[in-house]
Amino acid sequence: MENSSLMKVAVYSTHKFEKEYLEKAFSGKHDVKYISSPLTLETASLADGNEAVSIFVSDNASAPVLQILSKIGVKFLVLRSAGYNHVDLAEAKKLNIKVARVPEYSPYAVAEHTVALMLALIEN
């Protein structure tokens, strides 16, 4: 959907299993660019023209990457994870990039995943 009034968001490390849910959540609210590659020094420029970037826990949000994002106009960094140790928060603050994350995971989802892993181990 191309609408100049919608915030443009680049979503890095997009997995097939989450794209359906992201599309539902963003529908009519944001102009989304899905990028299957992780955020790195080499891929940061793919976010050019986007005001926000969404990343996963394995993406690189170090100071050099954040500097590139800032230079191309990124103002928001949204984490699709509770952990944020891969983000240079001091640099983000210095560059005036707002950072948001998932506050916590559902304890039910964690328990279900644990049981699924145990069943997979038993099967093998």
Task: Identify what each model region corresponds to.
Residues 51-124:
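Phosphate/diphosphate ligand-binding glycine-rich loop within oxidoreductases
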Residues 1-50:
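N-terminal glycine-/charge-rich "phosphate-binding" loop or analogous flexible N-terminal tail
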